[in-house]
C-alpha cells in the first residue's frame, strides 16, 4: 500500500475515535468541531490519494452536474416526498408527485443515487439520507435557487472575464458576468425587481450560518457593550444593524439577551424593509448606506456581509458615513465577515471570495486588507475575534480622533 495512503488511513482512524468520543458528550464544543474538521480534511485527502489522476480529473469535470441534479430533486418534489414518507418510495409514487416522464425520472433517480443524494434500497425503490434532508431545509432550497440562477452562471464566466481584463484584480462590476449580462445594472437593484428570487436570497441569508458558529458564540457581547450604555435614557440606541436584511441578527441578539436595554434599529433598502415583521421588537428604517446615517451616537453599529459586496472605494463611502455617526470613545463598529489568513485559508472562505469576484467584482478580505481599509477612513481595529477557520470573524472597530 502507498505510504501516504497508510498514513492517512491511520489519521482517519484516530480522528474517527476522537469524534466518536466527543459525540457522546460535547458534540458542539470547539474541540469537537475542530476534530470533525480535521477528520473531514483527512478523509478528502484520502479520497484523492485513493484515486488515479484520470479519476481525479473526472471528479472535477463531472462534479458540476451534481447541483443540477439536486435542483431537479427539489423542483420535482422528490426530496420532500422521500423525507415525508415513513416507508421506501417507489418510482411510480415519485412519478405521481413529480409529473415527470417515467424514463426521465428513472434517469434522474439514478443520478441522485450515484452522488449519494438519495439512498437506493431496491430496484426503483428509494429512501432519504442526510443529503436528501439537507435539501429540504430552508438553507438548502433557498440557497440552491440563488446559486442556480445567479452564482453558477457567474462562476462559469469567470476565466473569460479575467482573461479579458489581462488578469488584473477585478474592481469594476460592469466587467464581470453580472454587469455584462445585465448591461451594468447593479446587482442589488436587479435582485430587488425579482420578488421570488429576492425572497430566496433573504431566506438563504437568514440561514446562511446553519452548520457554523454564530458570532455571539465567541464575542463577549454583554461584557463588551453593556457597561458603558446609558440604559436609563429611553431614546438611547443600543444597536444599529446597517444593511441587515429582514433583521435576523437583531432577532438573534434579542433571543439570547431578552433583557437587553435600548433601541434596536434595522436599516436596509425600502423593498427589504417592507418585508420586516412589525411585531419583532425592532425599529425598521429604510436607509441607503451610501448616504449619511441618521442614527447618531449608537452604542454599536453592526455590518454583516455588507462590505464584502463592494470594492474598497465604495466601502470607504459606507464606512465614512458610519464613522461620522459614531461617538468617539463610546460607539463601536462590529464587522462580521471573513478575515482570511495569508496561510491556511479554508475553502468555504475562498469559494465565497471567488463567488463575490464573479458576481460583483467584490472580495473576502484578508486581515491585512481589513487593517488597511479601516485606517484609510479614520477607524481602528481594536480586536479581531475569530473562533474557527470556516466561521466569519467579528472585527471590533473604534473611531480615531
Curated annotation (Swiss-Prot):
GO molecular function: O-methyltransferase activity; protein dimerization activity
Database matches in InterPro entries: COMT-like, O_MeTrfase_dom, Plant_O-MeTrfase_dimerisation, SAM-dependent_MTases_sf, WH-like_DNA-bd_sf, WH_DNA-bd_sf
Pfam family, one: Methyltransf_2
Consequence of gene loss (knockout): Impairs methylation of the flavonoid skeleton at position C8-OH.
Gene Ontology BP term (one): secondary metabolite biosynthetic process
Keywords per UniProt: Flavonoid biosynthesis, Methyltransferase, S-adenosyl-L-methionine, Transferase
Function noted in UniProt: Methyltransferase; part of the gene cluster that mediates the biosynthesis of chlorflavonin, a fungal flavonoid with acetolactate synthase inhibitory activity. Within the pathway, cfoC is responsible for the methylation at position C8-OH of flavonoid. The pathway begins with the PKS-NRPS hybrid synthetase cfoA that uses benzoic acid or p-hydroxybenzoic acid as a starter unit with four rounds of chain elongation using malonyl-CoA to form the chalcone skeleton.
Family according to the record: Belongs to the class I-like SAM-binding methyltransferase superfamily. Cation-independent O-methyltransferase family.
Protein's name according to its UniProt entry: Methyltransferase cfoC
Species whose genome carries this gene: Aspergillus candidus
Name of the gene this protein is made from: cfoC
Amino acid at each position: 500500500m502507498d505510504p501516504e495512503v497508510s498514513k492517512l488511513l491511520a489519521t482517519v482512524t484516530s480522528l474517527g475515535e476522537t469524534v466518536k468520543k466527543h459525540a457522546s458528550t460535547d458534540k458542539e464544543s470547539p474541540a469537537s468541531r475542530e476534530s470533525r474538521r480535521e477528520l473531514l480534511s483527512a478523509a478528502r485527502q484520502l479520497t484523492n490519494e485513493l484515486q488515479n489522476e484520470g479519476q481525479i480529473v473526472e471528479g472535477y469535470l463531472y462534479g458540476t452536474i451534481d447541483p443540477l441534479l439536486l435542483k431537479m430533486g427539489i423542483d420535482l418534489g422528490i426530496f420532500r416526498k422521500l423525507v415525508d414518507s415513513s416507508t421506501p418510495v417507489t418510482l411510480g409514487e415519485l412519478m405521481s408527485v413529480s409529473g415527470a416522464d417515467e424514463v426521465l425520472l428513472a434517469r434522474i433517480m439514478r443520478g441522485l443515487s450515484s452522488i449519494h443524494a438519495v439512498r437506493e434500497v431496491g430496484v426503483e425503490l428509494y429512501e432519504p439520507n442526510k443529503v436528501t434532508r439537507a435539501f429540504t431545509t430552508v438553507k438548502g432550497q433557498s440557497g440552491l435557487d440563488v446559486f442556480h440562477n445567479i452564482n453558477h452562471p457567474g462562476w462559469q464566466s469567470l476565466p473569460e472575464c479575467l482573461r479579458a481584463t489581462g488578469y488584473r484584480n477585478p474592481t469594476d462590476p460592469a466587467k464581470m458576468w453580472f454587469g455584462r449580462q445585465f448591461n451594468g445594472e447593479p446587482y442589488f437593484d436587479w435582485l430587488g425587481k425579482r420578488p421570488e428570487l429576492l425572497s430566496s436570497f433573504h431566506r438563504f441569508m437568514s440561514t446562511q450560518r446553519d452548520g457554523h458558529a454564530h458570532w455571539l458564540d465567541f464575542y463577549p457581547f454583554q461584557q463588551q457593550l453593556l457597561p458603558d450604555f446609558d440604559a436609563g435614557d429611553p431614546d438611547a440606541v443600543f444597536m444599529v444593524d446597517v444593511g441587515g436584511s429582514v433583521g435576523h441578527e437583531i432577532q438573534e441578539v434579542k433571543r439570547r439577551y431578552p433583557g437587553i436595554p435600548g433601541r434596536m434599529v434595522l436599516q436596509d433598502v425600502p423593498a427589504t424593509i417592507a418585508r420586516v415583521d412589525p411585531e419583532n421588537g425592532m425599529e425598521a428604517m429604510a436607509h441607503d448606506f451610501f448616504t449619511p446615517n441618521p442614527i447618531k451616537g449608537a452604542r454599536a453599529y453592526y455590518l454583516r456581509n455588507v462590505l464584502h459586496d463592494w470594492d474598497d472605494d465604495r466601502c470607504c463611502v459606507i464606512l465614512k458615513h458610519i464613522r461620522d455617526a459614531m461617538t468617539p470613545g463610546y460607539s463601536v463598529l462590529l464587522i462580521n465577515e471573513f478575515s482570511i489568513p495569508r496561510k491556511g485559508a479554508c475553502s468555504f472562505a475562498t469559494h465565497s471570495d471567488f463567488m463575490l469576484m464573479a458576481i460583483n467584482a467584490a472580495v473576502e478580505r484578508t486581515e491585512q486588507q481589513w487593517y488597511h481599509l479601516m485606517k484609510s477612513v479614520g477607524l481602528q481595529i481594536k480586536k479581531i475575534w475569530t473562533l474557527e477557520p470556516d466561521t466569519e470573524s467579528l472585527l471590533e472597530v473604534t473611531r480615531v480622533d
